[in-house]
Amino acid sequence: MRLVISGGGTGGHIYPALALIEALKAEGKLDDVLYVGTKRGLESRIVPATGLKFATLDLQGFKRSLSLSNFTTVRKFLGSLGEAKKLLQDFQPDIVVGTGGYVSGAILFAATRLHIPTVIHESNSVAGVTNKFLSHFVDRVAIVFPEVAKAFPANKVVVTGNPRAQQVAGLKPNDRLRDFGLDPHIRTLLAFGGSRGAPRINDAVVAALPIWAKADFQVLFATGRTHYDQIKAKLPDLPATIKVVPYIDDMPSILPDIGLLISRAGATTLAEITALGIPAVLIPSPNVTHHHQFLNAQSLTKQGAAITITEDELDNHFPRRVVTLMEDDEKRAAMAKASKKLGVPDASDQLIAVMTTLLSKRR
Protein backbone atom coordinates (compact mmCIF):
# COMPACT_ATOMS: atom_id res chain seq x y z
CA MET A 1 0.00 0.00 0.00
CA ARG A 2 1.24 3.45 -0.93
CA LEU A 3 -0.12 5.91 1.64
CA VAL A 4 -0.33 9.68 1.89
CA ILE A 5 -1.33 10.77 5.38
CA SER A 6 -1.92 14.22 6.82
CA GLY A 7 -2.72 15.61 10.23
CA GLY A 8 -1.19 18.35 12.32
CA GLY A 9 -1.25 21.32 14.58
CA THR A 10 -1.51 19.28 17.78
CA GLY A 11 -0.29 15.91 19.01
CA GLY A 12 -3.88 14.71 18.99
CA HIS A 13 -3.78 14.84 15.19
CA ILE A 14 -0.20 13.65 14.73
CA TYR A 15 0.16 10.65 17.05
CA PRO A 16 -2.83 8.70 15.67
CA ALA A 17 -1.30 9.09 12.21
CA LEU A 18 2.08 7.81 13.39
CA ALA A 19 0.41 4.92 15.23
CA LEU A 20 -1.43 3.92 12.06
CA ILE A 21 1.79 4.00 10.07
CA GLU A 22 3.52 1.84 12.68
CA ALA A 23 0.70 -0.73 12.56
CA LEU A 24 0.75 -0.88 8.76
CA LYS A 25 4.51 -1.46 8.83
CA ALA A 26 4.13 -4.18 11.46
CA GLU A 27 1.59 -5.98 9.28
CA GLY A 28 3.78 -5.69 6.20
CA LYS A 29 1.12 -3.71 4.37
CA LEU A 30 3.00 -0.48 3.78
CA ASP A 31 5.12 -0.08 0.66
CA ASP A 32 5.72 3.65 1.01
CA VAL A 33 4.31 6.62 2.93
CA LEU A 34 4.37 10.39 2.57
CA TYR A 35 3.33 12.61 5.48
CA VAL A 36 1.95 16.03 4.52
CA GLY A 37 2.00 18.88 7.04
CA THR A 38 2.92 22.55 7.36
CA LYS A 39 6.25 24.19 8.08
CA ARG A 40 4.92 25.87 11.23
CA GLY A 41 2.97 23.06 12.85
CA LEU A 42 4.13 20.65 15.55
CA GLU A 43 4.25 17.95 12.87
CA SER A 44 7.21 19.75 11.24
CA ARG A 45 9.34 18.79 14.26
CA ILE A 46 7.85 15.42 15.20
CA VAL A 47 7.45 13.71 11.82
CA PRO A 48 10.91 14.33 10.26
CA ALA A 49 12.49 13.01 13.47
CA THR A 50 10.87 9.63 12.76
CA GLY A 51 12.59 9.36 9.39
CA LEU A 52 9.35 9.51 7.40
CA LYS A 53 9.10 11.37 4.11
CA PHE A 54 7.61 14.78 4.88
CA ALA A 55 6.16 17.40 2.54
CA THR A 56 4.57 20.75 3.41
CA LEU A 57 1.76 22.95 2.15
CA ASP A 58 1.29 26.64 2.98
CA LEU A 59 -1.98 26.70 4.92
CA GLN A 60 -3.52 28.28 8.00
CA GLY A 61 -6.60 27.65 10.10
CA PHE A 62 -9.87 29.56 10.27
CA LYS A 63 -10.52 32.07 13.03
CA ARG A 64 -13.73 31.35 14.92
CA SER A 65 -14.76 35.00 14.82
CA LEU A 66 -15.16 37.30 11.83
CA SER A 67 -11.63 38.14 10.78
CA LEU A 68 -9.87 39.42 7.68
CA SER A 69 -7.35 36.61 8.15
CA ASN A 70 -10.07 34.16 7.09
CA PHE A 71 -9.83 35.59 3.58
CA THR A 72 -6.14 34.70 3.65
CA THR A 73 -7.06 31.23 4.89
CA VAL A 74 -9.37 30.67 1.92
CA ARG A 75 -6.81 32.09 -0.51
CA LYS A 76 -4.08 29.81 0.83
CA PHE A 77 -6.39 26.78 0.70
CA LEU A 78 -7.33 27.42 -2.93
CA GLY A 79 -3.75 28.23 -3.82
CA SER A 80 -2.45 25.02 -2.24
CA LEU A 81 -4.80 22.72 -4.17
CA GLY A 82 -2.59 22.75 -7.25
CA GLU A 83 0.48 21.91 -5.19
CA ALA A 84 -1.46 19.20 -3.34
CA LYS A 85 -2.54 17.63 -6.63
CA LYS A 86 1.07 17.65 -7.85
CA LEU A 87 2.23 15.92 -4.66
CA LEU A 88 -0.38 13.23 -5.19
CA GLN A 89 0.36 12.81 -8.88
CA ASP A 90 4.09 12.49 -8.16
CA PHE A 91 3.69 10.05 -5.25
CA GLN A 92 0.80 8.02 -6.74
CA PRO A 93 -0.80 6.86 -3.45
CA ASP A 94 -3.32 4.04 -3.27
CA ILE A 95 -5.16 5.86 -0.48
CA VAL A 96 -5.05 9.17 1.41
CA VAL A 97 -5.86 9.43 5.13
CA GLY A 98 -6.44 12.58 7.18
CA THR A 99 -6.30 12.66 10.97
CA GLY A 100 -7.47 16.22 11.51
CA GLY A 101 -6.21 19.77 11.61
CA TYR A 102 -6.45 22.37 8.88
CA VAL A 103 -3.37 21.00 7.14
CA SER A 104 -5.28 17.90 6.04
CA GLY A 105 -7.92 19.92 4.19
CA ALA A 106 -6.10 20.61 0.93
CA ILE A 107 -4.47 17.21 0.40
CA LEU A 108 -7.66 15.28 1.19
CA PHE A 109 -9.83 17.52 -0.97
CA ALA A 110 -7.34 17.26 -3.82
CA ALA A 111 -7.37 13.47 -3.47
CA THR A 112 -11.15 13.39 -3.83
CA ARG A 113 -10.90 15.45 -7.03
CA LEU A 114 -8.38 12.91 -8.37
CA HIS A 115 -10.66 10.01 -7.39
CA ILE A 116 -8.14 8.55 -4.95
CA PRO A 117 -9.74 6.58 -2.06
CA THR A 118 -9.93 8.75 1.07
CA VAL A 119 -10.54 8.26 4.79
CA ILE A 120 -10.64 10.86 7.56
CA HIS A 121 -10.28 10.07 11.26
CA GLU A 122 -12.01 12.18 13.95
CA SER A 123 -10.54 11.51 17.39
CA ASN A 124 -12.66 13.93 19.45
CA SER A 125 -16.26 13.95 20.63
CA VAL A 126 -16.87 17.14 18.62
CA ALA A 127 -16.12 17.23 14.91
CA GLY A 128 -13.33 19.53 13.78
CA VAL A 129 -14.07 22.18 11.16
CA THR A 130 -11.79 20.59 8.56
CA ASN A 131 -13.21 17.10 9.06
CA LYS A 132 -16.80 18.38 8.85
CA PHE A 133 -15.97 20.02 5.53
CA LEU A 134 -14.11 17.00 4.17
CA SER A 135 -16.79 14.51 5.25
CA HIS A 136 -18.97 15.55 2.33
CA PHE A 137 -16.29 14.51 -0.18
CA VAL A 138 -14.28 11.62 1.31
CA ASP A 139 -15.21 7.95 1.13
CA ARG A 140 -15.17 7.03 4.84
CA VAL A 141 -15.21 8.81 8.21
CA ALA A 142 -13.62 6.86 11.08
CA ILE A 143 -14.59 8.00 14.59
CA VAL A 144 -13.76 7.27 18.23
CA PHE A 145 -16.75 8.67 20.13
CA PRO A 146 -20.12 7.39 18.83
CA GLU A 147 -21.81 10.69 19.72
CA VAL A 148 -19.84 12.55 17.04
CA ALA A 149 -21.41 10.45 14.28
CA LYS A 150 -24.31 12.88 13.95
CA ALA A 151 -21.92 15.51 12.56
CA PHE A 152 -21.13 13.39 9.49
CA PRO A 153 -23.00 11.67 6.63
CA ALA A 154 -24.40 8.52 8.24
CA ASN A 155 -23.52 6.20 5.34
CA LYS A 156 -19.81 7.06 5.63
CA VAL A 157 -19.29 6.66 9.38
CA VAL A 158 -17.54 3.72 11.04
CA VAL A 159 -16.40 3.48 14.68
CA THR A 160 -12.76 2.36 14.82
CA GLY A 161 -11.26 3.87 17.95
CA ASN A 162 -7.98 5.80 18.08
CA PRO A 163 -4.90 4.05 16.59
CA ARG A 164 -2.85 5.31 19.53
CA ALA A 165 -4.78 2.88 21.74
CA GLN A 166 -3.37 -0.18 19.98
CA GLN A 167 0.12 1.25 20.27
CA VAL A 168 -0.05 1.16 24.08
CA ALA A 169 -2.55 -1.64 24.78
CA GLY A 170 0.08 -4.32 25.28
CA LEU A 171 2.10 -2.40 27.89
CA LYS A 172 2.55 -4.17 31.24
CA PRO A 173 3.56 -3.02 34.74
CA ASN A 174 7.31 -2.43 34.86
CA ASP A 175 10.02 -0.72 36.86
CA ARG A 176 9.87 2.62 35.04
CA LEU A 177 8.89 4.45 38.24
CA ARG A 178 12.32 3.61 39.64
CA ASP A 179 13.76 6.05 37.07
CA PHE A 180 12.12 8.77 39.18
CA GLY A 181 13.12 7.36 42.55
CA LEU A 182 9.67 5.88 43.21
CA ASP A 183 8.61 2.36 44.17
CA PRO A 184 6.47 0.63 41.49
CA HIS A 185 4.81 -1.46 44.20
CA ILE A 186 3.31 1.55 46.00
CA ARG A 187 0.09 3.25 44.87
CA THR A 188 1.07 6.13 42.62
CA LEU A 189 -0.70 9.31 41.57
CA LEU A 190 0.45 10.88 38.30
CA ALA A 191 -0.41 14.53 37.61
CA PHE A 192 0.45 16.34 34.40
CA GLY A 193 -1.03 18.95 32.10
CA GLY A 194 0.58 17.98 28.82
CA SER A 195 4.05 18.60 27.37
CA ARG A 196 3.80 22.35 27.93
CA GLY A 197 2.05 22.03 31.27
CA ALA A 198 -1.23 23.60 32.33
CA PRO A 199 -0.93 26.53 34.77
CA ARG A 200 -4.27 25.90 36.50
CA ILE A 201 -3.51 22.22 37.02
CA ASN A 202 0.00 23.08 38.20
CA ASP A 203 -1.33 25.60 40.73
CA ALA A 204 -3.87 23.12 42.07
CA VAL A 205 -1.29 20.35 42.41
CA VAL A 206 1.28 22.64 44.06
CA ALA A 207 -1.36 23.66 46.62
CA ALA A 208 -2.23 20.00 47.19
CA LEU A 209 1.30 18.64 47.62
CA PRO A 210 1.60 19.40 51.38
CA ILE A 211 -1.60 17.41 51.96
CA TRP A 212 -0.62 14.58 49.62
CA ALA A 213 2.79 14.42 51.30
CA LYS A 214 1.07 13.13 54.44
CA ALA A 215 -0.94 10.45 52.62
CA ASP A 216 0.01 6.80 52.10
CA PHE A 217 0.65 7.03 48.36
CA GLN A 218 3.39 8.50 46.19
CA VAL A 219 3.10 11.29 43.64
CA LEU A 220 4.78 11.95 40.31
CA PHE A 221 4.09 15.49 39.11
CA ALA A 222 5.17 16.64 35.62
CA THR A 223 4.96 20.43 35.45
CA GLY A 224 5.78 20.97 31.78
CA ARG A 225 9.23 22.24 30.82
CA THR A 226 8.18 25.89 30.67
CA HIS A 227 6.96 25.99 34.26
CA TYR A 228 9.42 23.67 36.01
CA ASP A 229 12.06 26.09 37.29
CA GLN A 230 9.49 28.53 38.67
CA ILE A 231 7.51 25.80 40.42
CA LYS A 232 10.56 23.99 41.79
CA ALA A 233 11.88 27.23 43.29
CA LYS A 234 8.77 27.85 45.36
CA LEU A 235 8.13 24.29 46.56
CA PRO A 236 8.77 23.43 50.21
CA ASP A 237 10.91 20.46 51.16
CA LEU A 238 8.99 17.37 50.14
CA PRO A 239 9.32 13.74 51.20
CA ALA A 240 10.88 11.11 48.94
CA THR A 241 7.40 9.91 48.01
CA ILE A 242 6.80 13.04 45.93
CA LYS A 243 8.78 13.68 42.77
CA VAL A 244 8.47 16.80 40.62
CA VAL A 245 9.85 16.66 37.08
CA PRO A 246 9.59 18.93 34.02
CA TYR A 247 8.48 16.24 31.60
CA ILE A 248 8.14 12.48 31.21
CA ASP A 249 9.56 11.00 28.02
CA ASP A 250 7.57 8.07 26.65
CA MET A 251 4.64 8.80 28.96
CA PRO A 252 2.61 5.66 28.02
CA SER A 253 5.30 3.32 29.36
CA ILE A 254 4.72 4.61 32.88
CA LEU A 255 0.91 4.36 32.83
CA PRO A 256 0.58 0.63 33.72
CA ASP A 257 2.02 1.41 37.18
CA ILE A 258 -0.24 4.41 37.83
CA GLY A 259 -3.12 4.08 40.28
CA LEU A 260 -4.78 7.37 39.34
CA LEU A 261 -4.10 9.97 36.66
CA ILE A 262 -4.81 13.71 36.84
CA SER A 263 -4.66 15.25 33.38
CA ARG A 264 -6.33 17.14 30.56
CA ALA A 265 -8.86 15.30 28.40
CA GLY A 266 -7.22 15.29 25.00
CA ALA A 267 -8.17 12.50 22.62
CA THR A 268 -4.75 10.83 22.64
CA THR A 269 -4.57 10.73 26.43
CA LEU A 270 -8.04 9.21 26.66
CA ALA A 271 -7.19 6.60 24.03
CA GLU A 272 -4.14 5.58 26.05
CA ILE A 273 -5.80 5.38 29.45
CA THR A 274 -8.85 3.48 28.21
CA ALA A 275 -6.64 1.01 26.35
CA LEU A 276 -4.84 0.31 29.64
CA GLY A 277 -7.78 0.78 32.03
CA ILE A 278 -6.38 3.69 34.06
CA PRO A 279 -8.82 5.59 36.34
CA ALA A 280 -8.57 9.33 35.94
CA VAL A 281 -9.47 12.74 37.25
CA LEU A 282 -9.90 14.77 34.07
CA ILE A 283 -9.56 18.56 34.07
CA PRO A 284 -10.58 19.65 30.55
CA SER A 285 -8.89 22.57 28.90
CA PRO A 286 -11.36 25.45 28.44
CA ASN A 287 -9.24 26.81 25.58
CA VAL A 288 -10.26 24.35 22.87
CA THR A 289 -12.81 24.39 20.07
CA HIS A 290 -16.42 23.87 21.18
CA HIS A 291 -15.21 22.71 24.62
CA HIS A 292 -14.49 19.31 23.09
CA GLN A 293 -12.22 18.27 25.97
CA PHE A 294 -15.10 18.68 28.41
CA LEU A 295 -17.28 16.50 26.20
CA ASN A 296 -14.43 13.98 25.81
CA ALA A 297 -14.14 13.81 29.59
CA GLN A 298 -17.88 13.46 30.07
CA SER A 299 -17.90 10.45 27.77
CA LEU A 300 -15.69 8.64 30.29
CA THR A 301 -17.34 10.09 33.37
CA LYS A 302 -20.81 8.95 32.29
CA GLN A 303 -19.50 5.39 32.09
CA GLY A 304 -17.85 5.54 35.51
CA ALA A 305 -14.31 5.52 34.12
CA ALA A 306 -13.29 9.01 35.24
CA ILE A 307 -14.22 12.04 37.31
CA THR A 308 -14.51 15.38 35.52
CA ILE A 309 -13.44 18.51 37.39
CA THR A 310 -13.52 21.85 35.59
CA GLU A 311 -10.86 24.48 36.26
CA ASP A 312 -13.47 26.51 38.17
CA GLU A 313 -13.93 23.53 40.50
CA LEU A 314 -10.26 23.37 41.47
CA ASP A 315 -10.99 24.65 44.96
CA ASN A 316 -9.81 23.86 48.48
CA HIS A 317 -11.68 20.54 48.38
CA PHE A 318 -9.65 19.23 45.44
CA PRO A 319 -6.69 17.82 47.43
CA ARG A 320 -8.97 15.87 49.81
CA ARG A 321 -11.12 14.57 46.95
CA VAL A 322 -7.99 13.07 45.41
CA VAL A 323 -6.85 11.58 48.73
CA THR A 324 -10.27 9.98 49.23
CA LEU A 325 -10.12 8.45 45.78
CA MET A 326 -6.55 7.22 46.17
CA GLU A 327 -7.47 5.53 49.44
CA ASP A 328 -10.54 3.84 47.96
CA ASP A 329 -9.08 0.83 46.16
CA GLU A 330 -12.53 -0.57 45.40
CA LYS A 331 -13.68 2.65 43.72
CA ARG A 332 -10.54 2.93 41.62
CA ALA A 333 -10.79 -0.72 40.62
CA ALA A 334 -14.35 -0.12 39.41
CA MET A 335 -13.21 2.94 37.46
CA ALA A 336 -10.35 0.95 35.95
CA LYS A 337 -12.75 -1.77 34.84
CA ALA A 338 -15.08 0.80 33.28
CA SER A 339 -12.14 2.50 31.56
CA LYS A 340 -10.87 -0.76 30.09
CA LYS A 341 -14.35 -1.51 28.78
CA LEU A 342 -14.24 1.74 26.79
CA GLY A 343 -10.82 0.97 25.31
CA VAL A 344 -10.30 -0.16 21.74
CA PRO A 345 -7.03 -2.15 21.85
CA ASP A 346 -7.30 -3.10 18.17
CA ALA A 347 -8.11 0.40 16.88
CA SER A 348 -5.35 0.43 14.26
CA ASP A 349 -6.47 -2.95 12.93
CA GLN A 350 -10.03 -1.67 12.66
CA LEU A 351 -8.94 1.43 10.75
CA ILE A 352 -6.71 -0.63 8.48
CA ALA A 353 -9.68 -2.91 7.76
CA VAL A 354 -11.69 0.14 6.65
CA MET A 355 -8.85 1.16 4.36
CA THR A 356 -8.30 -2.28 2.81
CA THR A 357 -12.04 -2.79 2.26
CA LEU A 358 -12.20 0.56 0.50
CA LEU A 359 -9.25 -0.36 -1.69
CA SER A 360 -10.69 -3.76 -2.58
CA LYS A 361 -13.89 -2.10 -3.79
CA ARG A 362 -11.90 0.19 -6.08
CA ARG A 363 -10.01 -2.62 -7.78
From Swiss-Prot:
Q: How does it sit in the membrane?
A: Peripheral membrane protein
Q: Which reaction does it catalyse?
A: Mur2Ac(oyl-L-Ala-gamma-D-Glu-L-Lys-D-Ala-D-Ala)-di-trans,octa-cis-undecaprenyl diphosphate + UDP-N-acetyl-alpha-D-glucosamine = beta-D-GlcNAc-(1->4)-Mur2Ac(oyl-L-Ala-gamma-D-Glu-L-Lys-D-Ala-D-Ala)-di-trans,octa-cis-undecaprenyl diphosphate + UDP + H(+)
Per UniProt, which keywords does this protein have?
A: Cell cycle, Cell division, Cell membrane, Cell shape, Cell wall biogenesis/degradation, Glycosyltransferase, Membrane, Peptidoglycan synthesis, Transferase
Q: Which residues form a coiled coil?
A: none
Which amino acid positions bind UDP-N-acetyl-alpha-D-glucosamine, per UniProt? Answer: T10, G11, G12, N124, S195, I248, Q293
- The superkingdom listed in its UniProt entry is Bacteria
- Any idea where this protein resides? Cell membrane
What name appears for this protein in its UniProt entry?
UDP-N-acetylglucosamine--N-acetylmuramyl-(pentapeptide) pyrophosphoryl-undecaprenol N-acetylglucosamine transferase
Tell me what organism the protein belongs to: Lacticaseibacillus paracasei (strain ATCC 334 / BCRC 17002 / CCUG 31169 / CIP 107868 / KCTC 3260 / NRRL B-441)
Q: What is the lineage of its organism?
A: Bacteria, Bacillati, Bacillota, Bacilli, Lactobacillales
Q: Which gene encodes it?
A: murG
